[in-house]
């Protein structure tokens, strides 16, 4: 009886010591825990909790507090392994324009302004060139325009060259016409086949010419033969 009581008392003392040690490891304000990295402290606490759990399971009356300690240690390790919330990235400020960029922008603006002014000048010049010329004022009917008499004909308005041609006459105009295409010599090769044969060839027989007396005789003969061939009438 005494031995059993001493054994139970010893087990209770060991349990109290284990709980005190575990509470020290679970307290983050403890200097040993604060100096130890979190991963090392968590792994050491988990190992110690597992050892205590195995030791209590070997006893006749296991202590469930060691199991609760292991579960809490696992939760703490899982919470420490969760990633920290990612902060949204800070907006990147555009770089300030440099002096070279400002100079290029100013030069481009000056160049575009000069080009625009040149184009406007060109358009103005084109408009002046395309503007209609003022026409001469038409006077009243019968009045000469530009010193030209309204009674002049169309041939008179042609100028002095036409007057010279009219003075020379129409014969000079016809003499200038090229009549070479109308020459008979150009048509000789085409009309050679139409020429009569050589003189030595047989000549065509021409019908004999009859006099008027012979014609009258022939007419009388023809009339007489027709009268003979006609049958006599019933009264004859």
UniProtKB/Swiss-Prot annotation:
* Keywords per UniProt: Transcription, Transcription regulation, Ubl conjugation
SERTA domain residues are 38-85
Gene source species: Mus musculus
PANTHER family registered for this protein in UniProt: CELL DIVISION CYCLE ASSOCIATED PROTEIN 4/SERTA DOMAIN-CONTAINING PROTEIN 2 (PTHR16277), SERTA DOMAIN-CONTAINING PROTEIN 1 (PTHR16277:SF12)
Residue numbers spanned by region Disordered = 190-211
This protein is called SERTA domain-containing protein 1
Free-text tissue specificity from the UniProt record: Detected at in testis, lung and, at lower levels, in muscle, liver, spleen, brain and heart.
The record's Gene Ontology biological-process terms are:
negative regulation of cell growth; positive regulation of DNA-templated transcription; positive regulation of transcription by RNA polymerase II
Q: Does the keyword DNA repair apply?
A: no
Function of the protein: Acts at E2F-responsive promoters as coregulator to integrate signals provided by PHD- and/or bromodomain-containing transcription factors. Stimulates E2F1/TFDP1 transcriptional activity. Renders the activity of cyclin D1/CDK4 resistant to the inhibitory effects of CDKN2A/p16INK4A.
Q: Does the keyword Ubl conjugation apply?
A: yes
Q: What is the lineage of its organism?
A: Eukaryota, Metazoa, Chordata, Craniata, Vertebrata
PTM info: Polyubiquitinated, which promotes proteasomal degradation.
Q: Which gene encodes it?
A: Sertad1
């Amino acid at each position: 009886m005494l031995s059993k009581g001493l054994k139970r008392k010893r087990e209770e003392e060991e349990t109290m010591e284990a709980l005190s040690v575990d509470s020290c490891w679970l307290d983050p304000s403890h200097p040993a825990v604060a100096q130890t990295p979190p991963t090392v402290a968590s792994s050491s606490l988990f190992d110690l909790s597992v050892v205590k759990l195995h030791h209590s399971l070997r006893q006749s009356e296991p202590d469930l507090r060691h199991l609760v300690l292991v579960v809490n240690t696992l939760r703490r390790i899982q919470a420490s392994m969760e990633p920290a919330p990612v902060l949204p990235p800070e907006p990147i400020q555009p770089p300030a324009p440099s002096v070279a960029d400002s100079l290029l922008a100013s030069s481009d603006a000056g160049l575009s302004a000069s080009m625009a002014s040149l184009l406007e000048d060109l358009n103005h010049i084109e408009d002046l060139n395309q503007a209609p010329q003022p026409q001469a004022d038409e006077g009243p009917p019968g009045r000469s325009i530009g010193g030209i008499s309204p009674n002049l004909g169309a041939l008179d308005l042609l100028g002095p060259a036409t007057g010279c041609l009219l003075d020379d006459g129409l014969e000079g105009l016809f003499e200038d016409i090229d009549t070479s295409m109308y020459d008979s010599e150009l048509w000789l090769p085409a009309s050679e086949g139409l020429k009569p044969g050589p003189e030595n060839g047989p000549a065509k027989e021409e019908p004999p010419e009859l006099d008027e007396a012979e014609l009258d005789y022939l007419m009388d003969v023809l009339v007489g033969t027709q009268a003979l061939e006609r049958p006599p009438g019933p009264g004859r």
